[in-house]
Amino acid sequence: MMLAEALQESTDSDLQILRYRDDYTIFSNDSEKLKKVISTLHSVLSDLKLSLNERKTEFSDSSSLNILKKDKIASLRLPTSGSLGILKEAYSILMFTSEHPNSGQLCRILIEFSKRLQLEKNKEHVEQHFPQLVSILCEIAIRNRKHAQFPIAIISQLLSRPAIPDQQYKSDLAQQLVDRFKKQVNIGYIEIWLQRALLATGTQEDFNEALCKHVENTNTKPLWNVSWVKQDYLDKIAWNSTEFIDREALCKITPFIEMDEISVFEYC
């Protein structure tokens, strides 16, 4: 509102503002007016003791290209296993994440990659490069913790493949994964999804994340600080127990994590 009022005072209004979630794109036929908008926006934010993020603010004379984020453009260039083998495609995804860490595009990319891994024509390649694929997906999870559930879900799908019958081999590989993740710091979110992937396999692992300990039923400490809540309310809620864990649901989970379980939104 403050920006709109300031612009009405300082410019002729041939501006069009397009908003998508928390992204704003401002269009005009006059580049000088756009520069004036940026200057006005700086001034408005300054009055509020705020500043414009220069790294996320761009000026362009190409509305067709620059309306897309750089990670979106890069994702469109990614080859698929139709032109590459499965292993090379996995490496190309890893390279994408190194250039665009925690990109929202990674969710869509990995969902499509998961579908291709299930195709019969790729069965031989998947079995041939099984440990390498698991290792790459582990690296993707470490580099992109915001979306770690996606590579971990695919790892669970690989470990569930009946074409790899050696259970001891898969158990050893799962343990190597756990050991590799535990070398990292601040992995609470990863541990939650790693526990989900391993729970139905019977693999016993001691995770540090408090939620994981509640699932294991080994945590006697309150999960939340409720010292400020009146006792009358505390008596009505299961705040200091593991009653919020659905034990029946835990008994029904499978080692194979479906993408529907982790995809809250439809990525495109």
Model segments located where?
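Right-hand nucleic-acid polymerase module
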Residues: 69-268
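Long, contiguous hydrophobic alpha-helical segments, chiefly transmembrane helices and signal peptides
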Residues: 1, 19-21, 25-26, 41, ...
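Short, flexible coil/linker segments at or flanking structured domains
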Residues: 12-14, 22, 40, 47, ...
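Active-site palm subdomain of RNA-directed nucleic acid polymerases
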Residues: 1-22, 26-29, 33-36, 161-166
